């Protein structure tokens, strides 16, 4: 029975991350987003501030810069409270993003995400993405 419960929790955690990625792709940062992201969300990505509201601002800026943003998932695995995702990040750069003025260019970057789930909510995030490739695609 415990193994079945653990399996159910792992599947629920994977679904939670997929729901989050769907919110980001659709730009829906409303009620569902608030229900699945912890108020004190800690994003370990360099330069990020703690908190769900700061995450919303960051993701809204990304969604504005890349309105057709997609995060197709290649692999999603989970163990305990952690969910790991290997995905692409694609989109068309139509508005300023950091130091990069809108370019109209398509980007395609590989990323690895690790999420920690606490009490049914996303609590922490680590990311390793090919940011040099992103910068190169936006500059060329």
Task: Please name every model-derived segment.
Residues 1-140:
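C-terminal and inter-domain tail/linker signature
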């Amino acid at each position: 029975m415990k193994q079945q419960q653990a399996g159910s929790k792992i599947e629920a955690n994977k679904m939670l991350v997929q729901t989050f990625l769907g919110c980001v792709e659709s730009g829906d940062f409303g009620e569902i987003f608030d229900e699945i992201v912890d108020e004190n969300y800690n994003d370990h990505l360099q330069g990020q501030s703690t908190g769900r509201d700061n995450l919303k601002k960051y993701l809204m800026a990304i969604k504005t810069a890349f309105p057709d943003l997609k995060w197709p998932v290649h692999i999603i695995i989970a163990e305990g409270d952690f969910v790991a995702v290997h995905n692409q990040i694609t989109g068309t750069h139509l508005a300023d993003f950091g130091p990069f003025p809108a370019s109209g260019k398509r980007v395609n970057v590989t990323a690895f995400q690790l999420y920690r789930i606490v009490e049914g909510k996303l609590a922490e995030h680590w990311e390793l993405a090919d940011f040099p490739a992103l910068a190169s695609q936006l500059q060329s």
